[in-house]
Amino acid sequence: DGVAVSFKLSAFHTCFNVCNVLILIWFVHFIEKTVCKIIPQKEQEEEYRLQFITGGMLSTAELSILQARKEINLFAERIQRMFRMVRDLLHTENENDFNKLFSRVEKYENISDNMELEIANYLTQVSEGRLSSESKLQIRGMLREVTEIESIGDSCYNLARTINRKRRGNEDFTKAQYEHIAQMFQLTDNALTQMLDLVRDTHQQVDVNKSFNIETEINNYRNQLKNQNVIDVNEKKYDYQMGVHYMDIIAECEKLGDYVVNVVEAHRDVKEKKA
């Protein structure tokens, strides 16, 4: 009868759905990876927006300063991400992939400029309120941090442009040059990682010695490579122009390291004023 037919149909659909779930549940991760490859993710614009100071001033200056600190920390994280893109750019061989990554670095450079301006404007607004002398000194130090972090972004973009110029030429770096650049990039990334550890830590005493030690390593390595470059060019291990590109990268890393130390020193000053 009709009731029996309805019951059988319902039972069939229920069993069918249960079987589907039991079968497909084992392929969830595979399906996810397949869909992600077929449908490329859009670049997440929210990644590039300010996250902590978009709502304007808070009820007290101290809370506003705290929000600005969070934004500065996020700014520093994005700058390290930008540097790692540059590191990947050096070893990107496919022309289309290279152009996409270079464009992304350019985009990050523009974002860096905008973040510096917006955070600085916010801190300036905060400074116009009623503040203690200690809070005013904190803001001054934070403004310096923001300026130096933006300078790191400029250095990252300069590195990307040098890599792009080298790519447009007919020659390539030697194996030894690639190894030396990789070592310098690692030292630079270590400096950025140490900087992030310091700016994120709002409770402990800031020990800048490790940052200074890394900077000394970078300077010494730059000097060593600079001297060796003169010898290698004279011995015709590579031509003069490749030596120029090579040393531009090495020198820019050293300059980036200087900006990192400036951020660390500014943050130390902020912590001392706050203490």
Regions picked out by a protein language model, each given a short descriptive name:
Residues 1-12, 16-275:
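Cytosolic, long alpha-helical scaffolding segments
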